């Protein structure tokens, strides 16, 4: 009889094989290790473009093409697993975004024609520039190498508690309930309904596949597993999940759908939302810890959504529980790219924290990550929110936080390259009669103000029209007030704390520090020599080494450290 360890080993080997196959299919990629499986032979999607520029937008365009892509997905069932479902493809691949597009799609004749019509690495067709142009912003966006956030999708977090309470059938009932209250929002509700029905069809294909597989499975334990999987899928196709296995399977199906739609990878407080199901099933005698660990490992395998574990509540009570430990053990048992973040605080369970660090060092696989509650909570409270909300703002992204279901932060989609801002300031410094770091800093602030202004204009454009371009039809289902009002998450959020990354802080701090140290204090170099080095791309080795060997940011008490503080005040 196969043990859980045997099955996990097989699942991990399959994951590695799939990764190697995807590398051949996709070519070079600089992305997350998604939970995708390879594209099957004969897979094809015929996108529907509802814009003259050859792309699709809005409620009709996004819902229709989501249905086409998810309907093209074959069911994925592995008898070794307790949960089923995988995703293979995503809508962004059909909107001219070269960053995400895999080789298998780039090489198709129709897509080559699409790309030839104007999609580039910087300007894809994800934004409807025919209706909402921003040519007036592009010169400064290019000048300061700004990642604008215009056309940025997902990068917020929905509240999974809503889905766990309603189920997919509950979504449909809620859509019809509020459609009656907002008859003028029929396009919104039609689109939401189409998407939910497509997810249910996705589940139905898995049900059919499992039914076909059960008679042919020779191992009794795997045949029994498939029978349980079938009952689980039937239970969650319409109704809300009631057991630990059901809630994990429901999450797996939703995560596949949200990834297909906009690559959404924001999960939830994993040891919090799943805890009631775990405790209830344990008390009922229908779940043991080894099975719970296997199910969690299976969920992490299906897709590496970003989850937070541990943490602290608004009363400073540690949130670590038995499931927190099991999640770490589950991740260790599968040991793939698991996007788990441990929230560390003063009252953190020291044994749990030690175990988390142990797994990081043992597996050397980049998990778990750690975030500091004190800095994150106190920093967010400076925006005027209360302590409870700050503690609910959890780590559910690659480098960002969000209050699930309430916040629309655009995190990690907007960046100003402050090294490029410094470069422009250095160009202007040549015109100064007496160059100095003080004069350079004044010029830097002038250019930074311009960069911030044009960035804000781009953000406002996105917020004004995101619903008309890329409405978040899947995440809307679990966003507070979205279905209730018939409006997109971008317009109905309670909190708008737009995050703008200042990329290049270390480079700029080091540069200011090097100039002050080598030119002004030590007088080893002159400003003319610095300008000559910039013009020649530091061809003179002596000048390059003098500047590069200056005291660096984070070395402790350096000029660069002082500049870093000044740059961020």
Task: Briefly describe each language-model feature range.
Residues 201, 205-208, 212:
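Extended, non-transmembrane alpha-helical coiled-coils
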Residues 190-201:
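Extended non-globular scaffold/tether segments
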Residues 538:
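Active-site-surrounding "flap" and adjacent substrate/cofactor-binding loops of secreted or lumenal enzymes
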Residues 214-217, 221:
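A conserved hydrophobic secondary-structure block that centers on an alpha-helix together
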Residues 1-192, 221, 225-228, 232-239, ...:
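Conserved catalytic cores of very large enzyme subunits
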């Amino acid at each position: 009889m196969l043990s859980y360890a045997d099955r996990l080993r097989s699942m991990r080997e399959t994951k590695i094989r799939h990764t190697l196959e995807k590398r051949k299919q996709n070519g070079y990629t600089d992305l997350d290790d998604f939970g995708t499986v390879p594209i099957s032979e004969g897979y094809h999607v015929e996108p529907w473009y509802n814009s003259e520029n050859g792309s699709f937008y809005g409620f009709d365009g996004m819902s229709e093409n989501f249905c086409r892509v998810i309907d093209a997905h074959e069911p994925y069932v592995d008898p070794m697993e307790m949960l089923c479902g995988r995703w293979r493809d995503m809508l962004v691949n059909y909107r001219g975004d070269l960053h995400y597009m895999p080789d298998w799609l780039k090489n198709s004749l129709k897509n080559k024609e699409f790309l030839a019509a104007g999609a580039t690495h910087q300007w894809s067709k994800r934004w409807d520039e025919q209706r909402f142009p921003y040519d007036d912003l592009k010169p400064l966006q290019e000048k300061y190498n700004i990642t604008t956030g215009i056309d940025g999708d997902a990068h917020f977090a929905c509240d999974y508690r809503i889905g766990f309470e309603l189920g997919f059938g509950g979504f449909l009932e809620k859509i019809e309930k509020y459609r009656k209250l907002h008859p003028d929002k029929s396009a919104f509700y039609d689109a939401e309904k189409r998407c939910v029905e497509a997810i249910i069809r996705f589940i139905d294909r898995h049900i059919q596949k499992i039914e076909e597989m059960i008679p042919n499975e020779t191992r009794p334990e795997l045949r029994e597993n498939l029978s349980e999987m079938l009952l689980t899928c039937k239970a969650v196709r319409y109704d809300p999940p009631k057991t630990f296995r059901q809630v994990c399977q429901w999450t797996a199906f939703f995560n596949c759908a949200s990834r297909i739609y906009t690559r959404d990878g924001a999960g939830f407080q994993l040891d919090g939302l799943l805890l009631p199901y775990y405790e209830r099933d344990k008390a009922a005698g229908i779940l043991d810890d080894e099975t719970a660990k296997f199910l969690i490992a299976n969920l992490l395998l299906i897709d590496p959504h970003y989850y937070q574990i541990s943490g602290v509540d608004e009363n400073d009570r540690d949130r670590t529980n038995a499931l927190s430990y099991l999640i770490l053990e589950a991740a260790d048992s599968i040991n793939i790219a698991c996007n788990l973040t441990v929230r560390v605080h003063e009252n953190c369970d020291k044994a749990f924290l030690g175990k988390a660090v142990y797994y990081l060092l043992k597996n050397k696989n980049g998990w778990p990550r750690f975030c500091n509650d004190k800095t994150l909570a106190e920093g967010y409270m400076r925006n005027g929110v209360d302590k409870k909300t700050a503690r609910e703002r959890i780590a559910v992204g690659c480098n960002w936080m969000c209050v699930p279901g309430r916040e629309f932060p655009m995190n990690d989609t907007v960046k100003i390259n402050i090294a490029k801002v410094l470069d422009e300031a250095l160009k202007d410094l040549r015109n100064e009669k007496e160059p100095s770091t003080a004069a350079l800093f004044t010029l830097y602030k002038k250019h930074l103000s311009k960069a911030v202004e044009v960035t804000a204009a781009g953000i406002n454009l996105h917020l004004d029209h995101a619903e008309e371009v890329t409405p978040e039809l899947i995440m809307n289902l679990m966003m507070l007030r979205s279905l209730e009002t018939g409006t997109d998450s971008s317009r109905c959020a309670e909190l708008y704390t737009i995050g703008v990354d200042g990329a290049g802080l270390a480079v700029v701090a080091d540069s200011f520090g090097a100039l002050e140290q080598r030119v002004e204090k030590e007088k080893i170099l002159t400003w003319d020599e610095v300008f000559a080095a910039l013009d020649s791309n530091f061809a003179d080795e002596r000048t390059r080494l003098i500047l590069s060997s200056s005291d660096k940011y984070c070395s402790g008490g350096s000029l660069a450290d002082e500049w870093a503080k000044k740059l961020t005040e």
